[in-house]
C-alpha cells in the first residue's frame, strides 16, 4: 500500500498549509513544509495565514533558497480578515502583484465563523498565542442587501491576475453571491474550502458552486483522528466525493498547527484509506494532483 500511496502523491499539490509565522501556534514554517512536501513527491504547496499575506513570507524565504532547485514550488496568498483591513482591495492588489495565487475571502472574520464558534464553544479551534483585538465581522453584504462595492474591485483584481478565489469560511448565501459576481467579472478559478466545516453547506449548495465553475476542497484534518479538527469519519468524505464527483473535488491538508499531524503524514494516511476503501487510483490522483494543479498553475 505504501508504494501505491507514494505513486498517487507523486506530483501532488496542497493548496492549504498553515505554517509559522502566525499568531496561532504552528509546528512548521514554510521551509519545513516545503521540505516535507518534497520528500513526499509533491509538486507545489500554498501557505496560508488567517492574519497576514504569506506572499511576502515566500518572497523573503526565496532569498535564502526557497523555490530554488527541483523541490516543490511554494506560493502564498492573502485572507481578507480584520488584520489586513477586511475587504481591502489594496491588500489584494499588493498580494497578487507580488506573486500571490489565492485570495481567501473572510475566514476567522466571517460572520459565519464568528457565529459558528459562539454556538459551539467546545470547538477545538486553535487559541491565539498572542492577545489580539477581537476579530470584527467582515461581511460581504452591505446595508442594502447587495454586495459591498469593495467586492467587485477585489474580484476584478483576481480576474486580472488569473488567481484563485477561495470561499474562506463564509455562509453559503455569501459564497453564492460572491461566486456569481466573480463569474460575471471573469474569475476562472474558484475554490470552496471545507464545505461541511463552519460553512455548513449542503450537497445542493456545493452543486450550485460547481455549476459556477468552482472546485470543492476537503480538509484532511477533518478526517484524521489524530487531528484536533477531527469531526467526521471517512464515510462522510467518501459521501461528499460521490455526491459532487472526484472531477470537482480537491484534497488539502489544512494542517501545520502545533500538536496536529504533519500535512504530508495526513495525506499519506487518508489517501491510503481511500485506496483501501476501493476508490479508483485515478479518482484519488485527480483530487490530490490534477485538480489542484489546474487551479494553481498560472
Predicted regions and their residues:
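Extended substrate/RNA-proximal surfaces in nucleic-acid metabolism proteins
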Residues: 85-192
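Active-site beta-loop-alpha junctions enriched in small/polar residues
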Residues: 18-20, 50-52, 77-83, 106-110, ...
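Mid-to-C-terminal alpha-helical segments outside catalytic/metal-binding sites
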Residues: 264-298
